[in-house]
Amino acid sequence: MGETKVIYHLDEQETPYLVKLPVPAEKVTLGDFKNVLNKPNYKFFFKSMDDDFGVVKEEISDDNAKLPCFNGRVVCWLVSADGSQSDAGSVCADNQSDLPPPIERTGGIGDSRPPSFHPNTRGSQENLDNETETDSVVSAHRERPRRKETPEHATRLNGTSKMERRRDTGGYESSSTLMSSELDSTSFFDSDEDDSTSRFSNSTEQSSASRLMRRHKRRRRKPKAPRIERSSSFSSITDSTMSLNIITVTLNMEKYNFLGISIVGQSNERGDGGIYIGSIMKGGAVAADGRIEPGDMLLQVNDTNFENMSNDDAVRVLREIVHKPGPITLTVAKCWDPSPRNCFTLPRSEPIRPIDPAAWVSHTAAMTGSYPAYGMSPSMSTITSTSSSITSSIPETERFDDFQLSIHSDMVTIVKAMRSPESGLEVRDRMWLKITIPNAFIGSDVVDWLYHHVEGFTDRREARKYASNLLKAGYIRHTVNKITFSEQCYYIFGDLCGNMANLSLNDHDGSSGTSDQDTLAPLPHPGAAPWPIAFQYQYPLPHPYSPHPGFPDPAYSYGGGSAGSQHSEGSRSSGSNRSSTEKRKEREAKGGDTKSGGSGSESDHTTRSSVRRERAASERSVPASEHSHRSHHSIAHSIRSHHTHHSFGPPGIPPLYGAPMMMMPAPASVIGPPGAPPSRDLASVPPELTASRQSFRMAMGNPTKNSGVFDFL
């Protein structure tokens, strides 16, 4: 003999009960169920199927009536019929006996469904009590009348275990705003007060006096309010700020091969909570339409309603519909944009908005420097609840709008704009193989960003090629250092300092040829060049060196300052003092031979080019240990000087003459002259001895065009 499982929900209790009746499912009646429960003061509502509305809760009072069965089980809701327990939205009539029986909203089926798209049964305005015209919670422009319940007109309710007022929405025709009463994480608050109306945050759309009078009336008529569950209360201000519109989109599937959406099912302890749009694939019908966005709730596909349907059933039905020919009609409840592109300039039409985590994280990262935007000065930025944009107390030197990007812009400028927090490129922490990749972005997003923000690309293929060049140049890097670009991979920004060889402090005037553009040789190890600290002028220690036979007689230089450009006099500073003394004039007279060597910088372009080629050939033949310091020597004829005077050392220091005393940075193995102090790192040298650390860093970041010759300011 078969048995029937009956799952029933009792009043406001969250956990349902299960009883087994020793009767086959096709023969079980209400009387059989009552015999097991023995609860005389309850009304019984059963899950059943209605031809017009689909799944409903039907009240059955006849003991001989057979109970509707779904998947071999009966689902029932037991509601107290004593008339003393009603929720905050129910209306107390003048006669207590006229109070309609409260209906329990319980979970387990279709939980998290906003109630405004659960149409109730058809009713007439004539049955309304006068007090329902200005309900204390429902706004005036969305009037939801009450009516007396009759068994033959079953109510279609669903929710999270609470007693709810009846309202006639007339199907989907007039109710387009979804109340967010079951969004568990945002819109609930607890209250243990006896006055149930105080559980509602009332909007200002009604007269406060009428609400107050009605509150006192209910307080007199209600001896005790039942304990309301957490999910039974909602804030009407949440409804006003998170107004979700229901839209219907008809897609023509003849033009597209696939629908192009992924769906996500939400579940909690009380059952499945709806089907949501997870992501939208490019090239599909949904992406081409553009109205459906990730985060929207899928309510209906064609004529199939997804309410009260489990996630598995909804997925199965959706697959069946997609495989059928013909247009597809999707009904969705719109959600706010989960990842706005212009999150910093998004107009705020309402004073209170839900917090956008994406905007929050990106702004916080920008302010704390998690992924710094090169070229921007620090700015104190604040976002207020009513502000429509970011206000800066310190003006930024380069905002994203200031970048005029084209295919002729250098890559550094484009990467600067791409790294800007306002660029629109989605840069955030990603998970890959359970590894967190900080500040990563997807290759396809880079291609799209380049195509839409950089002028000059004829098609997306060229933008993809440009992104590949960014990868090869090191401006973006693959997480595992792959050299081939793929739109499906995660990338991070490369170190811009590693590509500073293309930059200089000053612009070139174009008068020099390409042979003047030398690249920066490798810098020596920090310990390879000790800094003398006996004098305030900085210059390398002398080092014996035999020049290449093809070189002219070398001279000396005590230069100090940033090397800068060959054509910029202002960026060079000579170690000599213009205020000549008699002793210096005598020194100039003695060093007549070296003057000609010092003025060798006026040699023509051809001579300097050939000298560099000879030097490069000779350096390729020496060991690497010698190359590290030979590549940084100072040759007077390699510096184009616009001055007629000559560089001399600081006062009191005799100049070095001849090839054996060539100015060279000493390698690590060379010990300083007797009595010299030990070498120290630049960071530990006092500011008065290092002249200008900032100028030094600028010189390090901007290589000169003269084979690595640096002057320190």
Curated annotation (Swiss-Prot):
Main subcellular localisation: cytoplasm
Residues spanning the signal sequence: none
Listed Polar residues bias regions: 87-98, 118-127, 199-210, 508-518
GO CC term, one of those recorded: cytoplasm
All copies of domain DIX, residue ranges: 1-82
PANTHER family associated with the record: SEGMENT POLARITY PROTEIN DISHEVELLED, SEGMENT POLARITY PROTEIN DISHEVELLED HOMOLOG DVL-3
PROSITE patterns: DEP (PS50186), DIX (PS50841), PDZ (PS50106)
UniProt record, GO biological process: ciliary basal body organization; cilium assembly; intracellular signal transduction; Wnt signaling pathway
Protein name: Segment polarity protein dishevelled homolog DVL-3
